From Swiss-Prot:
UniProt entry keywords in alphabetical sequence: Cytoplasm, Methyltransferase, RNA-binding, rRNA processing, S-adenosyl-L-methionine, Transferase
Designated name of the protein: Ribosomal RNA small subunit methyltransferase A
Upper classification of the organism: Bacteria, Pseudomonadati, Thermodesulfobacteriota, Desulfobulbia, Desulfobulbales
A molecular-function term among this protein's GO annotations: RNA binding
Function: Specifically dimethylates two adjacent adenosines (A1518 and A1519) in the loop of a conserved hairpin near the 3'-end of 16S rRNA in the 30S particle. May play a critical role in biogenesis of 30S subunits.
Cellular localization per UniProt: Cytoplasm
Superkingdom of the organism of origin: Bacteria
Alphabetized InterPro entries for the sequence: KsgA/Erm (IPR001737), rRNA_Ade_diMease-like_C (IPR023165), rRNA_Ade_Mease_Trfase_CS (IPR020596), rRNA_Ade_methylase_Trfase_N (IPR020598), rRNA_adenine_dimethylase (IPR011530), SAM-dependent_MTases_sf (IPR029063)
Gene from which this protein is expressed: rsmA
Species for this entry: Desulfotalea psychrophila (strain LSv54 / DSM 12343)
CDD domains: AdoMet_MTases
Assigned protein family: Belongs to the class I-like SAM-binding methyltransferase superfamily. rRNA adenine N(6)-methyltransferase family. RsmA subfamily.
A Pfam family assignment: RrnaAD
Reactions accelerated catalytically: adenosine(1518)/adenosine(1519) in 16S rRNA + 4 S-adenosyl-L-methionine = N(6)-dimethyladenosine(1518)/N(6)-dimethyladenosine(1519) in 16S rRNA + 4 S-adenosyl-L-homocysteine + 4 H(+)
Binding locations of S-adenosyl-L-methionine: 25, 27, 52, 73, 98, 120
Amino acid sequence: MSSYGRTRTDLKKHKLAPKKRFGQNFLVHKQTAEAIVRAGEVGEDDIITEIGVGLGALTVPMAHQAKHVYGIEIDNGIIKYHEEEQDLPDNVTLIHQDVLKVGFGDLAEKCGGKLKILANLPYSISHPLIFKLIEHRDIIPTATIMLQEEVADRLLAKPGTKEYGIPTILLGCCASIKKKMVLKPAEFHPRPKIDSAVITVDFTKPPELPEYNKELLSRVVRSAFSQRRKTILNTLSSASFFFAEKENKAKNKAMTEKTIEKAGFAVSLRPEVLSIQDFVRLTTVFEQEMNRTEE
C-alpha cells in the first residue's frame, strides 16, 4: 500500500477526518518527512518542539535523531489516535494544546532553556505563529517551518515588491531565512490547492544592523503599512507618535514630516520601497525626536 493509502486507512480506522478548522493536511511520504528533518539539522542532543504532530510523519524520524521531542497538537482526535496506536517512540511527549496559547517561556524551561522548533504549520495560523516566534526569539535559536509557499515568499520578499510587508521586515531584521524545498500538493492528504515550502529561520544569525528599539520598530513598521497605498507621511502621522491626535493633528504631521526628512527620506515614499535597514534608521530617528518632544 502507498503512503497515501496508509494515511487514509489510518484515518478511517480511527474514524478521523482532516479538520478544516485546524487546517490539517497530513504529510504522506516518508522520504519527504526525512528530508524535512534533515533540513532542520536535528542532532542527538537536541530537544525539539514540534508544532502540529498530525499522524507522526515528522515526529517519528525526528525522535529517532533527537534526544527528546515535545509535540504540540490541538486536535483531541489525533491525541487519542496516538494513545491507541502507541506508535510514537518513548522520547516523545505530546502536549494537547493550541500552540498560540502555549507559554513558550514555560516550555523552554523543560527544554533546557531553548526551543528548537520544527513545524508543519496549519495554513490558518502561519502569520500569528511567525509573530509569536519573533516575540520569543531570545529563546528560539532556530525554527524549521513548513507553510504555504506564498507566505514563504513574503518572508523572503525584496523591497518594492507586492509581497514585501510587515512579516518580511519584522522577521528579516532579527533572523536569517532560507527556503529549503518546495512541496507539491501530492505530498499531502488532503491535497491543498497550493504549493507548500519548507524554510529555516535562524535567530542566531540576524543581519548586521545598528542597535534599535525593537518595540518601536514594530510600531513604526505596522503603522507605515497600515494603509499600504498611502505615503509614509500620511500613515505615520496618523499613528500619533508625538502628540495626542485629536488636539494636535497638524503638529503631529509637522513633526512626522520633520523626522522623516531628518532620517534622509522623502515624505512622498510608500512603505514598500524602504528596506529593513531604512526602517531601522527611521525608527532610530523617531526615537530621538520622540525623546526630545518629551523633554
